[in-house]
Amino acid sequence: MQVLSSLRSAKNRHKDCIVVRRRGRVYVICKSNPRFKAVQGGKKKKG
């Protein structure tokens, strides 16, 4: 899975790619071609 600062180009790589939000991060998932998976958003500091 790639960690990207912008998912603008990642969501247009394949026709089956969809953008979802989970636990404060934005993911691009592609079930037909899993190599296009990507995530935006890193770790948050606690405290």
UniProtKB/Swiss-Prot annotation:
GO CC annotations on file: ribonucleoprotein complex; ribosome
PROSITE patterns: RIBOSOMAL_L36
Entry's transmembrane regions: none
Keyword annotations from UniProtKB, A to Z: Ribonucleoprotein, Ribosomal protein
InterPro entries per record: Ribosomal_bL36, Ribosomal_bL36_sp, Ribosomal_L36_bact
Molecular functions per Gene Ontology: structural constituent of ribosome
GO process annotations (BP): translation
PANTHER family given in the database record: 50S RIBOSOMAL PROTEIN L36 2, LARGE RIBOSOMAL SUBUNIT PROTEIN BL36B
Family: Belongs to the bacterial ribosomal protein bL36 family.
Protein name, as recorded: Large ribosomal subunit protein bL36B
Organism this protein belongs to: Pectobacterium atrosepticum (strain SCRI 1043 / ATCC BAA-672) (Erwinia carotovora subsp. atroseptica)
